[in-house]
Structure formats: C-alpha cells, structure tokens
C-alpha cells in the first residue's frame, strides 16, 4: 500500500478567484506562512491601508520623530485576524528578536525590525502587515476544492519588487492565467 501524505501550501501564494465573495479576500494575493493538518496562516500582500510606518512608529516610540522616509513605507492589511498584530516579511538575512526563516524569506514579528527599518539598518526590502489570515483544520483545503483559490509558487520578485496593485496579476501571469477569463462554473464538453 502506498503511503500518501497531504500536500501543504507553506511558502506559496494563494490567488483569490474572481468570484471570491468574502470581502476580506476578494482580489487578494496571500503569502502562506504556515500550512499543516492543524490549519493555515497567511498574509495578504496586496492591500495597503492608509497607515504608513511613520504612523506606527509614532505609537510605538512617541519620543522619537520618525524619519521622513517612513511615510513612504506602506502598511498592508494582512488579514482579518488580530488586526493589531504586526508581521514583517523580508529577505532572509538579518535576525531580530522574533524572526523565523521561511525558505528564502523571513518573517519577523518583534518591534525591533520596525525600528531597524526606520533607522536605515533593517532589511532594505519588506512587506509590513497588520493582521493575518487564518484557516482552521481542513478549511483551506475545502476552499481550494470549491475553486475559491489558485495556488502559485512563491516568487520574491512579486513580493518585494512588484508594486502592490500589480502583485495579483503578476502571480496569475506566472501561471499564464488571465483572471478576467476565469469562472466559478465547471462545464462538460
């Protein structure tokens, strides 16, 4: 008998299908941080909010004026769960108080990474989010089976060097898919 292990999507992108009804995920590109039999966690990487790094730093260390460059560092809506919790995706390299290596990209969750970015000594490339997307055991698999998502291999170029408004289409193009031509209906010839 063949031992079949499940396929997990850690370190991949999820592309929301055009018919995605949930407003938290419609037209999103999500990076999957973790996916196991117990559930999944991801960060939406193409929805900037009105906040920028300077706004966050004013709350974290009000005694220091944030450098002007921090106004140009966007903060993304990472998902609907724990929207007051910050996550920073950045290239593997520098380690901070809470950094996890995710196969060529790192996830840092401690404030020191934000201070390092602000002070010009942190990662040069980053995606900063507030909140995350979470799925219970079997939930993401069920959504995939109902054609809510396409999966796409991770690409650091899309994450760090593609403007946020183009990331979804760039991931779809990597699969040679035009999202405007997709439907939620299956047909038979």
Curated annotation (Swiss-Prot):
Parts of the chain that traverse the membrane: none
InterPro entries linked to this entry: AlgH-like
GO cellular component: cytosol
Gene3D superfamilies: VC0467-like (3.40.1740.10)
Superkingdom of the organism of origin: Bacteria
NCBIfam families documented for this protein: PRK00228.1-1
Family: Belongs to the UPF0301 (AlgH) family.
Protein name: UPF0301 protein PFLU_5755
């Amino acid at each position: 008998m063949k031992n079949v292990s499940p396929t997990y999507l850690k370190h991949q992108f999820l592309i929301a299908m055009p018919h995605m009804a949930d407003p938290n995920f419609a037209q999103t590109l999500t990076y999957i941080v973790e996916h196991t039999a117990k559930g999944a966690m991801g960060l939406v990487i193409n929805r900037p909010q009105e906040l920028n790094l300077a706004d966050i730093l004013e709350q974290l260390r009000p005694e220091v004026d944030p450098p002007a460059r921090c106004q140009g560092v966007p903060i993304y809506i990472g998902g609907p769960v724990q929207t007051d919790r910050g996550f920073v995706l950045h290239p593997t390299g520098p380690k901070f108080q809470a950094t996890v290596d995710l196969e060529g990209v790192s996830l840092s969750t401690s404030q020191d990474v934000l201070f390092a970015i602000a002070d010009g000594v942190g990662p040069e490339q980053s995606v900063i989010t507030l909140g995350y997307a979470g799925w219970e055991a079997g939930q993401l698999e069920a959504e995939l089976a109902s054609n809510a998502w396409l999966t796409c291999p991770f690409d650091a170029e899309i994450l760090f060097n593609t403007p946020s408004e183009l990331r979804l289409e760039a991931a779809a193009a990597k699969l040679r898919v035009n999202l405007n031509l997709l439907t939620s209906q299956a047909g038979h010839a």
